[in-house]
Structures are given as C-alpha cells and as structure tokens.
Amino acid sequence: MQQPQIIELPKFSDPRGNLSFIEQENHIPFVIRRTYWLYDVPGGEARGGHAYRENQEFIVALSGSFDVVLDDGKEKKTFSLNRSYNGLYVPKGLWREMENFSTNSLALVLSSTKYDANDYIRDYEEFLKYVKR
C-alpha cells in the first residue's frame, strides 16, 4: 500500500498574485474521476468518518485550514493543511476524518473513482475487520 504524503504543488508568483496547478498522473498518482469541495463547515463539525476500499484522494486547502486525521487501524496520523500549494495524497484503505475547519475554509478533493456507495466503509468496527484481512 502506498503511504499518505504531503505533495508540494508548483507555485508561480509575481506582483499579480500566485498560481498553482495539479496534473493527474504527474503531481498525483491517479487519473481524476471526480472532484468535489467542502465549504461552510460549521465550527466544531467534522467531515469524513469513513474509508474507501478502492478510491484514492488528493485533498487541498484552497482557503483557510483544517486537519485530516488518517487511521490505518493501528495508528492515527494528523496532517494539517493550510497552504493552497500543498495537498495530501490519501491512498485507499485508510479511515479519514477532517476536522478543525477554520472560518471560510475551502477544501478541494480530487478522487480516483466516480461516486460508488459500495466503495465506502462507514462503520469503524467494519473498517477494523477490513484492514485485518
């Protein structure tokens, strides 16, 4: 299994501002099949709370900040995202939660698969059984 990691994206700066971009299979190790974003998350609320059997993700804080907590069934690791030129690669098979959203934060999520409800593991006990196989 590949490991989660922060990937620094290209950043071009000049007096007019900054520009960053993402290229599939270059900056991220998969073809993008779905894109979604999270915004207006109320203070104290968390998102995620599931794992994927097949889907991989790349998560970028386009604005503001938040934490992504990844769990492989043995240990948890927290990644703080707060720069629009850094993203977190999340391999399949990890439980994920997103928390500590700052006011007006915007999370962009790129996915390797189209939406498939059967790919989700939404129960933590079921997830623990899944990773022990």
Which stretches of residues belong to each language-model region?
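Well-ordered alpha/beta subsegment
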Residues: 83-87, 93-100
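Non-catalytic, conserved peripheral segments adjacent to functional cores
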Residues: 1-86, 103-106, 110, 115-133
